Amino acid sequence: MSVSVALKAKPIAYGAVACANYVNLSGAGSISVKYEDVALLDKQNKESNVSIQLNGSDSPVFGSKLALQTFSQVYPKLFIGENDRSLVESWVETASALAGNHNFLELSSLLAQLDDHLIMRSLFVGYSLTSADFSIWGALKSNNMAAGAVRTGQYFNLARWYKFMDSQNAVSVTMEEFTKAVNISKKQKSSGPNYEIGLPDAIDGKVVTRFPPEPSGYLHIGHAKAALLNQYFANKYHGKLIVRFDDTNPSKENSEFQDAILEDVALLGIKPDVVTYTSDYLDTIHQYCVDMIKSGQAYADDTDVETMRHERTEGIPSKHRDRPIEESLEILSEMDKGSDVGLKNCIRAKISYENPNKAMRDPVIYRCNLLPHHRTGTKYRAYPTYDFACPIVDSLEGVTHALRTTEYRDRNPLYQWMIKAMNLRKIHVWEFSRMNFVRTLLSKRKLTEIVDHGLVWGWDDPRFPTVRGVRRRGMTIEALQQYIVSQGPSKNILTLDWTSFWATNKKIIDPVAPRHTAVESGDVVKATIVNGPAAPYAEDRPRHKKNPELGNKKSIFANEILIEQADAQSFKQDEEVTLMDWGNAYVREINRDASGKVTSLKLELHLDGDFKKTEKKVTWLADTEDKTPVDLVDFDYLITKDKLEEGENYKDFLTPQTEFHSPVFADVGIKNLKKGDIIQVERKGYYIVDVPFDGTQAVLFNIPDGKTVNRYGVKN
């Protein structure tokens, strides 16, 4: 028998591979497993996430459900045992329904059903592993939302069983094989970014690039790529980088955003040669508008917004398209005054009303806005649009190469038309792809709505893709720079996963993040060490075993310690376990309440024991007054769908819950941490201090590491 697995399948056939490894480890057979870097093994078969080829058979069996049933038929002693086959296969059916289900309500009902079934059971059927267990485990593992929900602890019995399954050799081997296969696939594909892509007509020492943010929000990571790319080419050709604020819309802009953008640019390590403002050129731009009208290339129009949108869509000329030049000039004068007549009008470029490219259908180039400008006050009442102002200021400031994201592709002909119409100096437009991420909104309008509706705490919310948001979540500036540079100046439009983003950060923080200990305070178990120290005492231990430069921390030892409920649940009578950073101990007594929860333990130290021989290495904390209350906060993405399609409203895909709090007791060293310090809480992950200990508690935010599974199972 041989098994083939599609690495990119949704869902991935973890259960079938675990069964194959279970057979191999048991000695009942020898099954080869082949991993293919595809979404489907057979493009015509939507169920072909896995296939089984039986010896002597001409055609393979496709799909997780049929694969599990095949294992049960070929190896009944292993996967059915003494149990009722129909009962085992009914759970395989349930697993099939679970694997691809992302409906939150239906999923919750299924998980509750599984949890209830396990109240008095260790396994789904009988007293030994069956294909029922492997199928349910595989379904949970492949369904990120389901696996994440289990890890929240809401489904206590299911979480206990899931942890047990993760400890099985067949499962461990399966996950190691998948990780290895994925890494090999990535390595084969990765050739690194090509920074040898040059700019057209670039002359060393003469290249001028510009990064033109609008001061209407905070920089997000997409802007960061644009800024770093402009700096890259300016440096490559020993030229000049301009940071220019496109500040021609008083309705959206303010000095707070402007100052924040400058701070973020500095944090990114970007040093512009000059900072400029489009608003400094408003008089010059206005004169270009006058000249456009005089040359018959622009006209005043009072068509209402809805009618104009309809006419542009249908290719219908405005009734004012042939308005006399003098009349248009008079109306522009009224717009400059902000009069009633001026407010009803705009100025449109006279290009074409039926061009296949709708961006070219007589776009608006000037409009009124009576709101005070954050730099010029009420001096101006009419302002140019970005499409009109940008080529003018680019030309005036000597820009040689305008780097624009591919989303502007339809507007690039408009940019070139403006240059030609106003006899401006030639400027090269060079395209690059913007960075898009799964389950992430980068639209400034949508991000503003989310802030305004109170769905997040602000623009620096750790769930936000802003530079400030990812920094607050624990992304280092060094890692952010490395990641963006690693993407290269590609023009390929990709939707990126956050995995590599945070994995880059982990490489930076892991060698320097001090290690600390914490145990969940909910249902925490007190363990008495019968041969423990008579009185608590402290010893110096390294803050990071592989980095002595970080110094030492105080570790407190006592005869009463705290252990997490999940760890206590896994203990067996007289089992030898390892208390991390102390030594081995025997479990001499386990006390439970009526619900099955462990209420207390008695341990006996065995410090001469070999930690390499113990199955369980657990964290613990001395139950003394020095233990520190901490709120560990984890987050999920704001939307549930990887990529929103055209016309889809993000409000229909908001994640039900995106903020999760876990109260813990941590070691005394937490009290000395400052805001922004990054640590690793052993067996829990990396964290950044958001609120230092204030006498009551500290608040730490989880830092994704590219491997951990977040709430609802989302990989960050």
From Swiss-Prot:
Catalyzes the attachment of glutamate to tRNA(Glu) in a two-step reaction: glutamate is first activated by ATP to form Glu-AMP and then transferred to the acceptor end of tRNA(Glu). This is Probable glutamate--tRNA ligase, cytoplasmic. It comes from the Eukaryota. Its main location: cytoplasm. Component of a yeast aminoacyl-tRNA synthase (aaRS) complex formed by methionyl-tRNA synthase, glutamyl-tRNA synthase and the tRNA aminoacylation cofactor arc1 in a stoichiometric complex. Interacts with arc1/SPAC30C2.04. Its EC number is 6.1.1.17. A motif ('HIGH' region) lies at residues 215-224. GO terms for biological process: cytoplasmic translation; glutamyl-tRNA aminoacylation. Gene3D superfamilies: 1.20.1050.10, 3.40.30.70, Glutamyl-trna Synthetase, Domain 2 (1.10.1160.10), Glutamyl-tRNA Synthetase, Domain 3 (3.90.800.10), HUPs (3.40.50.620), Ribosomal Protein L25, Chain P (2.40.240.10).
